[in-house]
Amino acid sequence: VVTLPLMAAAAQEPSLQDLGDALTPPATAVIYTAKEIVTLDPAQPTAQAVAVQGSRILATGSLEQVRTHLGRRPYRLDATFADQVIVPGLIAQHDHPLLAGLTMTSEIIAIEDWVLPQGTARAAHNRSEYLQRLKEANDRLKDPHALLLTWGYHQYFHGQLKKADLDAISSTRPIIVWHRSAHEVYLNTAAERKYGVSRGWFDSLPESPRKQSDFANAHYWEQGLFAVLPKIGTAIASPERIQAGLQFVRDYYHANGVTLGAEPGG
C-alpha cells in the first residue's frame, strides 16, 4: 500500500518509473476532481484534485497544481466525483497485517468458518472435530518432519489441549498450535526437540515467564510466549511464510476495500 504522503515524498527524486516514462510514451493520466479529497498528509490534509495513472497516484492538490505537476504528460479530466468526498479507502488502524498473514496462511482449524481466497476453512465445533481435523492436516503432509503450524484453537470450544494429544497426532513431525488469540502456543515433543525447548532452557527463565508457562504440556502464554518465541520464531515466521502471508494480506485487504493497514507498536 502506498499512501499519498509517501508518493509526495517519492516525487521529489527521479525514480525507475520516471526513467521508464522517459523511454516510453506515457499513458494518459486521469485527473479526478471532487468536493474534497482526504489525503492523510498533515501538510496538505485536503485537496480538490488527484491525478492517477494506472494504480499510481501522481499528484494531489488544486486542479491547477495537479495540471502543473503533470507538465506535458497527457491527461483527461473526470468529474465523476465532483460533488463527493474521496477518502483513502477503509483505514484499518489495528488489524495486524503481519499476524494476519502468518495465521491465515497456516492450517486454519478455528471456531468459525473462514472464507478465504484459497478456500473455506470450516469450523471445528468441539474437541473431537478439532483433533480429527488436526489428524487430517498431519496426514496431508508428505514429509514426516515438516512443520505443521495451525491456528484457531480455543479451549472453550475444543477442550484442554495437552502435549500428549499432539504427540498422538505425530511423534516425528513438529506441531505448533497457535491459539486463536495469538497469545498462546502449544508444542508437541518433536517441536520441543527440533527447536531446543528443553528443561534446562525453561529453568533458566525468569520467574514471570515460567509462571505463564506449563512446561509439562509445552503450553506458553503471554510472557511465556515471548520467552519461547526466539526458539520457534524462525519456523513460524520464515522468509517464505512472511512473503506468502504479506501477499495474501495485500490481495485480501484490497479485495475488501482496505487500502491502509497498521501493525500497532507496543
Language model features: what each stretch is:
Residues 1-7:
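Bacterial N-terminal signal peptides
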Residues 8-12:
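Short, low-complexity disordered leader/linker segments with a strong preference
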Residues 14-34, 38, 42-266:
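Divalent metal-binding segments
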